[in-house]
Regions:
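Class I SAM-dependent methyltransferase SAM-binding "motif I" and its flanking Rossmann-like core
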Residues: 120-161
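Boundary at the C-terminal end of the N-terminal hydrophobic targeting segment
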Residues: 19-21, 26
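Bacterial N-terminal signal peptides
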Residues: 5-16
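Helical hinge/lid and interdomain linker segments adjacent to catalytic or ligand-binding clefts
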Residues: 38-123
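Short, solvent-exposed loop/turn segments at secondary-structure junctions
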Residues: 36-37, 81-83, 116-118, 139, ...
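Catalytic beta-strand/loop cores that center a nucleophilic Ser/Cys/Thr
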Residues: 144-215
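Short hydrophobic beta-strand segments
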Residues: 26-38
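Extracellular ligand-binding/catalytic regions of CAZymes and related secreted enzymes
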Residues: 27, 100, 207-252
Length: 252
C-alpha cells in the first residue's frame, strides 16, 4: 500500500512540474503560410508534424492574434523566398509583438532557413534587416550561391549530408548559452541550435531537414537519404518543458 501511494505521489509531482509532456494530439502547432514563404515549405513541415500526430494549423497575416496563440505548443516559420523582409512587411507591428510575447512567456519558435534569418538580426549587403529579434545575434548567409545543393554538416558530432538552399549561418560567439545541435563542416558556423528567449525557446535550423525526395529530384540532386528523424528529434527537444513558466507581460 505504501509503495502504491508513493508511486501516485511521484506521478502527481511529475505532472505538476511539467515533466510529463502532452501527447502530440493535444499539442496545437501554428505554421505560417503567407507572403515570404517558398512553395512547398509550409506543406512539408505540416505533413511531417501531422504524421507524427500533432494538430497543425496554417496561419497567415492578420491571424497572429493573442487568441490564436493561446494553447499553442509551437509556432513554425518555414523556409521562404530570398527576401526574408517579405514576411516582416506582411505582418503588422502588433502581430510581431504578439509573436514575441508568446515566445517570451514560454512559447516555442521553430525557424527553418528563412525562419532562421527572421529569428535574429538579418544582414543583407551590410544592411540590417528588421526581424523578430528573438536571437541576440546577427544572422548571415552561409554561402552566396543560391542554388540548391547537398551540404555537409556535423549534427551532434556526426557528419550528415542534407538539403540546403541559401540557408543562414548563426554567430555562435553571441550565443554562449545556446544548445548547439549542428555546425557547417566547411566554416564551423552554427547550422542548428536552441536558445532561450525570456521563458520560451527558439529553435533555428539552416538546412532544409524537412525536404522530401521530390525536392532532390526537382533540383537534380542525388538524395543522401531524408533527414526527417533528425528534425523530429530537434522538435521533440524544443517542445520539452522542464518547468512551468510564470506569465510575464512583454513590453515594447
Amino acid at each position: 500500500m505504501l509503495k502504491i501511494n508513493l508511486f501516485i505521489l511521484m506521478i502527481t509531482v511529475a505532472m505538476s512540474s511539467g515533466a510529463i509532456a502532452q501527447s502530440p494530439q493535444a499539442q496545437k502547432i501554428l505554421i505560417y503560410k503567407g507572403p515570404g514563404t517558398c512553395q512547398g515549405c509550409p506543406e512539408a513541415i505540416s505533413s511531417l508534424l501531422t504524421k507524427a500526430g500533432f494538430n497543425t494549423q496554417y496561419i497567415k497575416p492578420g491571424q497572429l492574434t493573442k487568441k490564436n496563440f493561446k494553447k499553442t505548443a509551437m509556432y513554425v516559420q518555414p523556409g521562404g523566398s530570398d527576401d526574408a523582409s517579405e514576411v516582416i512587411n506582411a505582418l503588422s507591428k502588433n502581430e510581431i509583438k504578439n509573436l514575441k510575447s508568446y515566445v517570451f512567456n514560454g512559447g516555442k519558435y521553430l525557424g527553418i532557413c528563412s525562419g532562421g534569418y527572421l529569428a535574429g538580426r538579418h544582414i543583407v549587403d551590410k544592411e540590417t534587416i528588421k526581424s523578430f529579434s528573438l536571437l541576440p545575434t546577427t544572422v548571415d548567409e552561409e554561402q552566396e550561391d543560391p542554388d540548391s545543393k547537398i551540404e555537409r554538416i556535423k549534427w551532434k558530432n556526426k557528419k550528415r549530408s542534407v538539403y540546403f538552399q541559401s540557408g543562414p549561418a548563426f554567430n555562435l560567439k553571441h550565443l554562449p548559452n545556446a544548445d548547439i545541435w549542428a555546425i557547417y563542416t566547411k566554416t564551423g558556423n552554427g547550422a542548428a541550435l536552441i536558445n532561450k528567449y525570456g521563458h520560451g525557446k527558439v529553435g533555428v535550423i539552416g538546412p532544409h531537414l524537412e525536404a522530401t525526395e521530390d525536392w532532390f529530384d526537382d533540383s537534380d540532386l542525388e538524395s543522401p537519404g531524408l533527414s526527417h528523424h533528425l528534425l523530429m528529434d530537434f522538435i521533440n527537444t524544443l517542445l520539452q518543458d522542464k518547468s512551468i513558466f510564470k506569465r510575464i507581460i512583454l513590453n515594447g
